[in-house]
Amino acid sequence: MNKQQTKFLIAFAAIAMANKEGFTVDAANLQPVTSGYAVAVADTQNSFGLEGLANVVKYVSEHPNINAFGGWYNREDNMYYFDATVIVNELEAAKELGRVNKQIAIFDLANLKEIRL
């Protein structure tokens, strides 16, 4: 992990600790994303813990088309998951990208609602 990735890892971990229920932040500036639809990337599915977080940071740094980081707490298994995330403005396009990435849901950031696929 290079110096820039390490800085993102530390910042990302702090964001996760401050937002225990979940969050989505812009990959470039780590500012909250409040509109559009968050679609997790299949390649970082089931990333949890420090190792999972490091994998997501590395993946995003190597894939410039990934424009956000996400994290969410799963009450069913009591684990905090991290995702490389694409923010899509159009609902139908987001749903299609979600299906391509084998997701069970996407997230409407403006209304803070899960959309099952």
Tell what function each PLM region has.
Residues 1-117:
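Conserved, structured core segments of small domains
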